[in-house]
């Protein structure tokens, strides 16, 4: 083959290859000018668009259209041709109906925070492969959803309808749904058939609705065999719902309801449950054995319930003490009776539960004589003595008269004000006890003012109150927290009144240092005055000596022949005194005094007479360059007039 033939063949092949590539170039669409495109991701969000721009590339997979003003009319029909689009974000727009003209292969659609009111079967039929549908924060009501609108969306797994206007659960939901969120709606009733087909449902959220026990069907949750999480927070339930699914349920949220009673079998067969929350209800007691079937329970939250720690709750303490360390229980704190308020149930000993024995007619209490001698010395608890058939019951009245109970204060309190903000409290107890409640209140009145209280253990005998108001009265009270001791049945508090120290006596932070600082000044007031007086006298004597020396030398206090030159400077010269910022000033009287500049520059010869004026009472007439003065004379730092600014 010749060279020319070969070159012709190569050129022809290149031409055919170019023709083959031309259709591809024509089919590739550029990115819309208002958007940004990046490998299938089309970003048209936050641009105040009222419609979806045309010309979106065919290879687009995800459309970001949120935070615009797109309405239903702004969705073009050519959007249906984008077969590769699987995710569309259209939240925070102006849609009032479920949009149409969407790509048929979309799997994830975000429509939350619009104003969508109606959902039709035809609109959902256009997206048959939808898996996640987010319709939160719209205006969807039960009547605005067409019956069976979702029935052919057989791939739908997540349906979010939170914060809408639903009064019932939509009918005809597909069996494929795994997560259903209906929180913050107006649902008041759920019939047994509403959820019976949702056998694949794993998470059901019904928070913030109007549900009560009568509005829930008796078997409404029984068919949810794969349900792992059920949330009924912020409803109006008075007890846990019946017939909960026990095969898979792992999380149960019942907080913020009106529950005041828990039936004994409420949690039967919930063997997989590991988290249970019944906080913020009105529960006062729990039936014994309520948690026996919860083999996997590791998190139990019972906060903010008015627990009454009576005899019926003693089993809870025993159960808590037998739990392994992996089980986390929170919120079992006594609110009543008053003697144990603020104490955790787990820390109570058995005597505090007030479980008095139910003694029949053949049992009497013979404790007065025996325990009066034993209890104060040995600290033993009163015990009932059972009557024997052959023993005649003793005369109780006679026993009280022969061995009266000694009247003695059970608690003796002593207080001492330490600083303006602290009070030291100490006390003595006549009988052994487990705990005491200490309270303090600003003011003497037990009615007005907020009360602060704390629980102190029985082995303590002192306490320090801090962060108090200075110079303020306080009422401090203590009351024993016992029930098993017959001498402590009276819960009347023992109170004492005191005041914090005044501010003039104490400094809350540096009191000791301040007192140490005051001592030197108390002893140094006299020497300091003597030093000042001596200095004043010395200055006065020096000035007087200078005047006498001047008069003695010149024969007169005012001389016209006195020369002010640099060669005559001595320590007692007025020029030297001027450099020491003497309190005298120089007044120019006549032009007969020669001025000699310090920098030896020639000046115009002028003669001056300098007269020294002493201000009365030692008042300084010296003015620096920063003080206000009407004089036209400026001063250097040494106090001598600046020769460049002197005037006659």
Curated annotation (Swiss-Prot):
Changes after translation: N-glycosylated.
LRR repeat ranges, renumbered to this chain: 58-82, 83-105, 107-126, 127-152, 153-179, 181-197, 198-223, 225-246, 247-269, 270-293
Membrane-topology descriptor: Single-pass membrane protein
InterPro entries registered for this protein in UniProt: Cys-rich_flank_reg_C, FN3_dom, FN3_sf, Leu-rich_rpt, Leu-rich_rpt_typical-subtyp, LRR_dom_sf, LRRNT, SLRP
Region (Disordered): 624-648
Extracellular side: 29-527
Keywords: Cell adhesion, Cell junction, Cell membrane, Cell projection, Developmental protein, Disulfide bond, Endoplasmic reticulum, Glycoprotein, Leucine-rich repeat, Membrane, Repeat, Secreted, Signal, Transmembrane, Transmembrane helix
GO biological process: cell-cell adhesion via plasma-membrane adhesion molecules; embryonic morphogenesis; fibroblast growth factor receptor signaling pathway; head development; heart development; neuron projection development; neuron projection extension; proepicardium cell migration involved in pericardium morphogenesis
Pfam families: LRR_8 (PF13855)
Name of protein: Leucine-rich repeat transmembrane protein FLRT3
Organism of provenance: Xenopus laevis
Gene that this sequence comes from: flrt3
């Amino acid at each position: 083959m010749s060279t020319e033939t070969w070159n012709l063949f190569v050129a022809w092949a290149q031409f055919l290859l170019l023709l083959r590539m031309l259709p591809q170039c024509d089919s590739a669409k550029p990115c819309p000018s208002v958007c940004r495109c990046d490998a299938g991701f089309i970003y048209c969000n936050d641009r105040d668009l009222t419609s979806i721009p045309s010309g979106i590339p065919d290879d687009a997979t995800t459309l970001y259209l949120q935070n615009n003003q797109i309405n239903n009319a702004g969705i073009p029909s050519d959007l249906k041709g984008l077969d590769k689009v699987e995710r569309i974000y259209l939240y925070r727009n102006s849609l009032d109906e479920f949009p149409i003209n969407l790509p048929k292969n979309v799997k994830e659609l975000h429509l939350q925070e619009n104003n969508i009111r109606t959902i039709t079967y035809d609109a959902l039929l256009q997206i048959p492969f939808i898996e996640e549908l987010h319709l939160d924060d719209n205006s969807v009501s039960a009547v605005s959803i067409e019956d069976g609108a979702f029935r052919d969306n057989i791939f739908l797994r997540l349906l979010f309808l939170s914060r809408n206007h639903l009064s019932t659960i939509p009918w005809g939901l597909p069996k494929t749904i795994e997560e259903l969120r209906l929180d913050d709606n107006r649902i008041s009733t759920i019939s047994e058939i509403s959820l019976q087909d949702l056998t694949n449902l794993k998470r059901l959220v019904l928070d913030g609705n109007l549900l009560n026990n009568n509005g829930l069907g008796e078997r409404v949750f029984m068919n949810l065999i794969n349900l792992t999480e059920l949330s009924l927070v912020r409803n109006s339930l008075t007890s846990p719902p019946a017939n909960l699914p026990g095969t898979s349920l792992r999380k149960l949220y019942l907080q913020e309801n009106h529950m005041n009673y828990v039936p004994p079998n409420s949690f039967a067969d919930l063997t997989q449950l590991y988290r249970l929350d019944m906080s913020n209800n009105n529960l006062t007691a729990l039936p014994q054995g309520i948690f026996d079937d919860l083999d996997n329970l590791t998190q139990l939250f019972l906060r903010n319930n008015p627990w009454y720690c009576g005899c019926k709750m003693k089993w809870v303490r025993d159960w808590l003490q037998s739990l392994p360390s992996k089980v986390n229980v929170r919120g079992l704190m006594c609110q009543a009776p008053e003697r144990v308020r603020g104490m955790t149930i787990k820390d109570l000993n058995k005597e505090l539960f007030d479980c008095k024995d139910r003694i029949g007619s053949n049992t009497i209490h013979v404790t007065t004589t025996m325990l009066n001698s034993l209890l104060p010395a040995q600290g033993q608890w009163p015990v009932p003595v059972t009557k024997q058939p052959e023993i005649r019951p003793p005369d109780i009245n006679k026993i009280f008269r022969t061995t009266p109970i000694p009247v003695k204060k059970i608690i003796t309190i002593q207080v001492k004000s330490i600083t303006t903000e602290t009070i030291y409290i100490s006390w003595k107890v006549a009988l052994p006890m487990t705990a005491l409640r200490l309270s303090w209140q600003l003011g003497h009145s037990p009615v007005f003012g907020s009360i602060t209280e704390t629980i102190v253990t029985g082995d303590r005998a002192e306490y320090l109150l801090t962060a108090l108001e200075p110079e303020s009265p306080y009422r401090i009270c203590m009351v024993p927290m016992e029930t098993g001791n017959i001498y402590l049945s009276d819960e009347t508090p023992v109170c004492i009144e005191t005041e914090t120290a005044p501010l003039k006596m104490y400094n809350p932070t540096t009191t000791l240092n301040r007192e140490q600082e005051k001592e030197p000044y108390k002893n140094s007031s006299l020497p300091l005055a003597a030093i000042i007086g001596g200095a004043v006298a010395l200055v006065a004597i020096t000035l007087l000596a200078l005047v006498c020396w001047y008069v003695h030398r010149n024969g007169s206090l005012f001389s016209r022949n006195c020369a002010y030159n640099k060669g005559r400077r001595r320590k007692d010269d007025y020029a030297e005194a001027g450099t020491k910022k003497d309190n005298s000033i120089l007044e120019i009287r006549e032009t007969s005094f020669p001025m000699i500049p310090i920098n030896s520059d020639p000046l115009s010869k002028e003669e001056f007479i300098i007269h020294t004026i002493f201000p009365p009472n030692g008042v300084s007439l010296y003015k620096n360059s920063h003080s206000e003065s009407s004089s036209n004379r400026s001063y250097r730092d040494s106090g001598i007039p600046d020769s460049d600014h002197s005037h006659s």
